[in-house]
Regions:
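Intrinsically disordered, low-complexity charged/polar segments
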Residues: 58-63, 133-145
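Short, low-order "capping/linker" segments at domain edges
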Residues: 68-73, 140-152
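Short, structured motif recognition centered on aromatic/hydrophobic residues
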Residues: 3-9, 25-28, 37, 41, ...
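Extended, compositionally biased
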Residues: 52-79, 87
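A cross-kingdom feature marking solvent-exposed beta-strand/loop segments within repeated
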Residues: 12-30, 47-50, 93-101, 121-123, ...
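Short aromatic-glycine-(Arg/Gly/Cys) micro-motifs in beta-strand/loop hairpins
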Residues: 1-22, 72-96
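Mixed-charge, glycine-accented linear interaction segment located at domain edges/termini
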Residues: 100-140
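Short, well-structured hydrophobic secondary-structure segments
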Residues: 30-62
Length: 152
């Protein structure tokens, strides 16, 4: 189970015209706590930002699953709200449960296509209620270091 945190980084960015401008960019980090999320985003951003930067905001993000893409054109992240439809055994009524997933794609049509591909093996019936582009710049899932050995 992943716990995702949306971290906002504020720094001075050199624009295309050569001027410096203060910008705030959101990133998504997989971490166990707010403290770890802050440490991870600082570690991930340090090589890419010259000069000072601050973590201006950290909040929990409610994503149940991620569908990343290796395609170069897929440079945007789309938030998709899915509604799973199940039958209640006792009453026989339909029960709807919503969940949010994140899909990396080139555009809206591509996001829906990749979402359907990712959900192909799902046994439950679902409906796509919403697909919208997010302002997320990048996503950093947790990966164990190769030299980290589990304690015995």
């Amino acid at each position: 189970m992943h716990t995702w945190f949306e971290c906002k980084i504020r720094y001075e960015k050199t624009m295309d015209n050569g001027m410096n401008k203060k910008v705030t960019e959101p990133y998504l980090v997989d971490a166990l706590s707010f403290t770890e999320a802050e440490a991870r985003i600082i570690e991930e951003m340090t090589p890419f930002i010259s000069g000072e930067f601050t973590v201006s905001d950290i909040k929990r993000a409610n994503y149940s699953e991620l569908f990343p893409s290796e395609e170069e054109a897929a440079d945007r992240w789309f938030k998709c709200k899915l509604i799973f439809i199940t039958l209640d055994e006792k009453s026989g009524a339909e029960k709807k449960t919503s969940t949010q997933v994140l899909v990396q794609a080139a555009d809206l049509r591509d996001a829906v296509k990749k979402l359907d591909e990712g959900m192909k093996g799902t046994m439950a019936d679902y409906q796509i209620a919403l697909v919208s582009e997010t302002p997320l710049m990048d996503v950093y899932p947790y990966s164990a270091e190769p030299n980290d050995k589990p304690e015995v």
